[in-house]
Structure formats: C-alpha cells, structure tokens
Design a protein with these regions (language model features):
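Short, hydrophobic secondary-structure boundary micro-motifs
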Residues: 107-110, 146, 198-200
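Amphipathic alpha-helical segments used for helix-helix packing
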Residues: 87, 96-118, 164-167
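C-terminal peripheral helix-coil segments that are non-catalytic and often amphipathic
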Residues: 2, 97, 128-139, 158, ...
Length: 200
C-alpha cells in the first residue's frame, strides 16, 4: 500500500511539474492534456485523468505547487525583514529575484492569473493580504493615510507588469536586483509618511 501511495504521489507530482512547464512554454489556453502527457513522457492522457478530475483540478494543483515554491523562496526573506516598510520592500525585491530562480513557475503563474484567476482563492487573496498589511502599517504609524484597496491594486498590477516583462526577457540577476530596488523604492515612497510628519 505504501509503495502504491508513493508511486501515485510521484506520478501526480510528475504531471503537475509537466503542466507547469507546458503552461510556461505555450500558455494556459494551449496546455492540453495531450501536450502535458507528451511532455511528461506518459503513454496516454488517461494517466492524467486518473489523477485529476479535469483541467480545473490540475490547474488548482499547479497553483498550489507554484505557491509552495514561491513561498519557500520569498517567505523566509519577508519574515526576516524588520517592520512593515522593510517587509513591503522585501516582498517586491524578492518577487523580482524569483523570476531568475524559478522562471517557469513565474511564467506559468502569470498566465494562470491572467486566464483563470477566479479558480485560485490563494491567488485572489493577494489583494486582501496587502490591504491588511497596509492597514496594519497605518495603525503602527509607518504608512501615511491612503485608501488601502486602491494602493493594493496599484501595487499588485504594477508589480505583475514588471514581473511579466522580466519573465519574458530573462534579464541577468543583477538587472533583476536593480528592477526590484527601483520598484520597491517607488512603493515605499508612495506609502511613506510625509517628511513633515503629516499625511500626504
């Protein structure tokens, strides 16, 4: 029983990895079961259907795997940052660094978000996470007063746009680091308290 369970889990992981790589290469719309099966070296699409109820089920597994990979890369850096401002900066900078470390995962997630974001509560939850982060920072007196939803939307859309460009052009790590600093500077300044101590 343990051997069969291990084999089944291994096969699922193999299919998910292949699906992520196919989505990164040809896009979500063209990522058919036949393409994924061929990429995974499977004899038929029936192997995929055995492990997943359909494309939506496979997509959910792909998003979960990508989020695990990205979380393992980014979260320790964010947790090590001291305070709301530093965490904001680290989130942005590590997002750009992620492009260099896991390009296929980033490209796949971008395409999934663009085509099927409604199917991933975790992806959609980014907005709520940033809203809460900004509220907490305002309550702590480190962010100026602003509409947290508007700024969260601006952050996510702006960051995603830069990440999309970086994922397409595959710049060197030093360039990714520069892009991360530039974008982080922009958002830190946009949310910072007025130099005179009042609100902007």
């Amino acid at each position: 029983m343990q051997a069969r369970t291990f084999t089944g889990s291994g096969r699922r992981a193999q299919i998910v990895t292949a699906a992520i790589e196919v989505i990164a290469e040809v896009g979500y719309a063209k990522a058919s079961f036949s393409r994924i099966a061929k990429h995974a070296g499977l004899s038929s699409t029936g192997m995929i259907s055995y492990h997943f109820a359909g494309k939506d089920d496979l997509l959910t597994a792909c998003v979960a795997e990508i989020e695990q990979v990205t979380g393992a890369f980014m979260q320790p850096r964010i947790d090590a940052a001291d305070g709301h401002v530093a965490q904001l900066r680290t989130y942005v900078e590590s997002n750009l660094a992620l492009v260099g470390e896991h390009p296929a995962a980033v490209r796949a997630l971008i395409d999934i978000v663009k085509n099927a974001a409604s199917q991933s509560p975790a992806v959609n939850g980014r907005l709520a996470v940033f809203e809460e982060h900004f509220r907490a920072g305002q309550a702590a007196g480190v962010f100026r007063p602003f509409d947290v939803r508007t700024v969260a939307i601006a952050l996510i859309t702006g960051l995603d746009a830069v990440v999309v460009t970086a994922a397409d052009t595959a710049p060197e790590p030093t360039e990714l680091a520069r892009l991360g600093r530039e974008l982080a500077d922009l958002y830190v300044r946009a949310t910072a308290l007025d130099p005179e101590g009042g609100s902007a």
